[in-house]
């Protein structure tokens, strides 16, 4: 009897297995390709973020403080310098840093007893931005002067918006929670009052009112020919006889200000990137109105 061969059946089975293996391999390859593509994109994004975090950041160039000015107003001859009331923090971007949005930057300050977190007093929805642009002959100028004709106050001089709009009535700002900006250098005009973006080559001063102000809120109709002006970091009302009076107090970050021999620490923290470090100890006595602290 003749024996039948089954080679054909075996060949078809092998072909089916082979096709199945090819299909499985194709599906696996597709999964691997998709996964590798996703991982590649994630790694690129992570790399960009890491580069941004490492390269970007803010550098604190220097910190300058201003004490109470000697009171040279009419009716006063005091020359005491008790507290630092204003801080000017000079900052620039790190080398290789991408643009830093100062409206999303925070300033952290601590005197060992209190820590404050400050944000920019301005933005597109703010009518009174604490923002000044251009080189100034006095970066601490918060000086106001009004004269009265018996009916109205006449504005003779206004201080820098970077200072006065931290506390000026109607701004809804709190000098104990906000900082201002003075633009010293900005070649590409990236620093605007609504969107202050710090780029390569830019230099700005962050203004912080660390001490209190005293404000006169009198009625000009009752103060004929009076003068209303600041005496350093205070508001003084000077009447026609040379007598001064002070009333309503505006609080700064550290109450009356920073006394002598006080250690201050803090950071200027951008939205991303390395923060700028603030650390200094004030002198044991204040002998000058303006002094470099860091």
Curated annotation (Swiss-Prot):
Residues 1-8 form a propeptide. It is found in: Archaeal flagellum. Its main location: other. One of its GO terms (molecular function) is structural molecule activity. One of its GO terms (cellular component) is archaeal-type flagellum. GO terms for biological process: archaeal or bacterial-type flagellum-dependent cell motility. The keyword Plastid does not apply. It holds the Pfam family Arch_flagellin. Disulfide bonds: none annotated. Keywords: Archaeal flagellum. The keyword Cell membrane does not apply. Flagellin is the subunit protein which polymerizes to form the filaments of archaeal flagella. Belongs to the archaeal flagellin family. This is Flagellin B1. The gene is flaB1.
């Amino acid at each position: 009897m003749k024996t039948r061969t089954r080679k054909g059946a075996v060949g078809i089975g092998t072909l089916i297995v082979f096709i199945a293996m090819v299909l499985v391999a194709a599906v696996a390859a597709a999964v691997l390709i998709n996964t590798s593509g996703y991982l590649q994109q994630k790694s690129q994004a992570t790399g960009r973020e890491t580069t941004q975090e490492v390269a970007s950041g803010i550098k604190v160039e220097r910190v300058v403080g201003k004490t109470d000015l000697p009171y040279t107003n009419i009716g006063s001859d005091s020359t005491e310098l008790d507290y630092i009331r204003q801080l000017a923090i000079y900052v620039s971007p790190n080398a290789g840093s991408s643009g830093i949005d100062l409206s999303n930057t925070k300033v952290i300050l601590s005197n060992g007893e209190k820590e404050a977190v400050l944000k920019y007093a301005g933005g597109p929805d703010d009518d009174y931005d604490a923002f000044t642009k251009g080189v100034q002959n006095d970066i601490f100028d918060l000086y106001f002067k009004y004269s009265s004709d018996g009916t109205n106050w006449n504005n003779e001089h206004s201080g820098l918006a970077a200072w006065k709009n931290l506390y000026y009535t109607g701004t809804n700002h709190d000098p104990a929670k906000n900082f201002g900006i003075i633009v010293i250098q900005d070649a590409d005009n990236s620093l605007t009052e609504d969107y202050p973006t710090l780029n390569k080559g830019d230099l700005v001063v962050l203004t912080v009112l660390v001490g209190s102000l005293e404000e006169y809120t009198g009625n000009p109709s009752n103060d004929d020919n009076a003068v209303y002006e600041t005496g350093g970091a205070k508001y003084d009302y000077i009447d026609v006889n040379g007598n001064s009076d002070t009333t309503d107090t505006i609080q700064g970050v550290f109450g009356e200000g920073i006394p002598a021999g006080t250690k201050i620490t803090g950071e200027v923290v951008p939205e991303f990137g390395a923060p700028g470090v603030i650390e200094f100890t004030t002198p044991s006595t204040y002998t000058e109105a303006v002094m470099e602290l860091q």
